[in-house]
Design a protein with these regions (language model features):
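Conserved Class I S-adenosyl-L-methionine
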Residues: 58-60, 178-271
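A short SAM/SAH-binding and catalytic strip from SAM-dependent methyltransferases
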Residues: 113-126, 149
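Conserved class I S-adenosyl-L-methionine
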Residues: 2, 7-49, 60-64, 83-86, ...
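Helix-to-beta-strand junctions that scaffold the AdoMet/dcAdoMet cofactor pocket
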Residues: 123-124, 137-139
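A short acidic, Gly/Pro-enriched loop at the edge of an enzyme's catalytic core
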Residues: 106-114
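Short glycine-centered segments of the SAM/dcSAM-binding site in methyltransferase folds
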Residues: 50, 141-142
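Conserved catalytic/acceptor-binding region of the Class I
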Residues: 127, 142-211
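Class I SAM-dependent methyltransferase SAM/SAH-binding core
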Residues: 52-105, 128
Length: 271
């Protein structure tokens, strides 16, 4: 899904009603794509690679992944019909797409690169997840993952708080987002235990200049807030969004442009 909403996956990849909104998500395409290219720079290209892109979204960046690696085969996997509807335009020449939950992905040691940009934050229990993804790799396979880690910013904390307030808490059935993304040093330890002979793990702060503080609402509306939108009754969602806007904006500097620091974890390992 290349969708950096942040949260747990039981509720995510199997979420209730609404689908992703590609147009809303891609309003900040340049800013959201920058970490993809940083992650791709960590990958060691090899001839005839078989690549899997977990959470491929619209497929546009998957096409770039396939092209830059000159891969023999690249499979983009996503669970969003709306996102995958866009991907058909990029299929062909060894690149194809499948609708599937990330939890349903499994392979028997025949993948040269498992790549995931801004998707695994939707999946819980990262230690068993990384173990499963490692099992899909060939003997010299690589794992490359980027995940948002901005859950302690007011843009995220405000949404978490409002979800616990009436009338939204009852409408959400008491649902609370869990945060599965671990500290960078924990991922480094996991990669070591899983037998990766080389690794690179870092926390990076991306410096985004948005038009105004109001743009933060639109940014988060295309990612994190989608989880609440699809869980809430249609008549409550506008009220949630308005309360979020009224609560968040006073916490942010009224500046033009508005500086929005966004933390992300990037990890890469080679067996």
């Amino acid at each position: 899904m290349h969708a950096e909403g942040d949260g747990e996956k039981n509720a995510l990849t199997q979420s209730p009603s609404a689908d992703w909104n590609p147009a809303q998500y891609e309003r900040f395409r340049d800013e959201r794509s920058r970490p993809f290219f940083d992650l791709l720079d960590l990958v060691q290209p090899r001839p005839e690679m078989r690549v899997v892109d977990l959470g491929c979204g619209t497929g546009e960046l998957t096409r770039e992944l396939h092209r830059q690696l000159s891969a023999r085969e690249t499979i983009g996997i996503d669970n969003s019909p709306a996102m995958l509807a866009k991907s058909a335009a990029f299929a062909g020449g060894g690149l194809r797409f499948e609708q599937k939950d990330i939890d349903a992905f499994a392979s028997e040691g025949d993948v040269d690169l498992v790549f995931s940009n801004a998707a695994l934050q939707w999946v819980p229990d990262h230690e068993p997840l990384l173990r499963r993804l490692t099992a899909a790799l060939t003997q010299r396979g690589q794992l490359a993952v980027q995940m948002p880690a901005n859950n302690d910013h007011p843009s995220h904390l405000t949404a978490f708080a409002i979800a616990g307030e009436p009338p939204f808490r009852a409408a959400l059935g008491g649902y609370e987002r869990q945060w599965p993304v671990l500290a960078p040093e924990v991922y480094a330890t996991l990669l070591h235990r899983l037998g990766f002979r080389e690794q690179h793990v870092r926390l990076q702060v991306y410096a985004h200049e948005l038009e105004s503080r109001e743009a933060v609402v639109e940014w988060v509306r295309g990612s994190l807030l989608t989880d609440y939108e699809r869980r809430l009754p249609a008549e409550l969602w506008p009220h949630f969004l308005e309360r979020y806007r009224q609560r968040l904006l006073p916490q942010l500097e009224d500046a033009r442009p508005f500086f929005y620091p966004f933390k992300r974890v990037l990890l890469w390992g080679a067996r």
